[in-house]
């Protein structure tokens, strides 16, 4: 393959991001520094006609300046097969709109390298993919059956109940064995979600943090520890979690070694896994975050390592 000139960035609109913690911004900034031309578009601007995939896009220039971080050019209708690389970076929810975009991008890959591979993104939902490694996980139940969930809670004691396709800590509940609101919680989930939900044993180690580990082409390259707020079980930064520097433990390296081959096999060049204590809880392949935080705490320049891996794939 030839080198990289044009990079499409499929993302939520650049005007709405917070650059201090946005991994898509970090990835795009590194691409710009390498001399690539960036083309910005949102998923709703994708089209398929006569077997070709188009997007209404704008050339994008970035600056690492809060409040003045981007300039967009005029709208252009672009045949996405003219892109060398496309970054698939819109945030979940992992709904039919998201799934449809992966079908369209699959028409382009691998001649145009889509990061991550859209077919495998579609076939590897983050809270289901992880169940391929049951010995690395906490006890987990995926179901919509309230009786099954009640039995699971009786067995486990405290549990976490969360949407199967949510993100950012939204809709995550900690329910104790004696929770009087448990029936109401199940009723609320039944009304809100048509698909199954996920129940997981509560891990007290979350009070010490939920570690986000970043992997490039199956190899761990950096990590941060996300500590939840005092009265919250969620460590996501969106809901008040606090990031801190960390190193990988022997157990965490073992987890990375176990899952690395599966990530490489599926073309996942950039992945973020979540580990609580000794347990793997999620494998994030859609739009993982953490690049800027790792660098902020003196860790690797993950965006640079990622583009090194992309260039190697394109060579």
Curated annotation (Swiss-Prot):
Keywords: ATP-binding, Glutathione biosynthesis, Ligase, Magnesium, Manganese, Metal-binding, Nucleotide-binding. It catalyses: gamma-L-glutamyl-L-cysteine + glycine + ATP = glutathione + ADP + phosphate + H(+). SUPFAM superfamilies: Glutathione synthetase ATP-binding domain-like, PreATP-grasp domain. Disulfide bonds: none annotated. InterPro entries: ATP-grasp, ATP_grasp_subdomain_1, Glut_synth_pro, GSHS_ATP-bd, GSHS_N, PreATP-grasp_dom_sf. Gene3D superfamilies: 3.40.50.20, ATP-grasp fold, A domain, ATP-grasp fold, B domain. GO terms for cellular component: cytoplasm. Pfam families: GSH-S_ATP (PF02955), GSH-S_N (PF02951). One of its GO terms (molecular function) is ATP binding. ATP binds at residues 153-209. The keyword Magnesium applies. Binds 1 Mg(2+) or Mn(2+) ion per subunit. Pathway: Sulfur metabolism; glutathione biosynthesis; glutathione from L-cysteine and L-glutamate: step 2/2. The keyword Cytoplasm does not apply. Mg(2+) binds at residues 282, 284. Its EC number is 6.3.2.3. Residues 127-311 form the ATP-grasp domain. Its cofactor is Mg(2+); Mn(2+). Belongs to the prokaryotic GSH synthase family. This is Glutathione synthetase. It comes from Rhizobium meliloti (strain 1021). The gene is gshB.
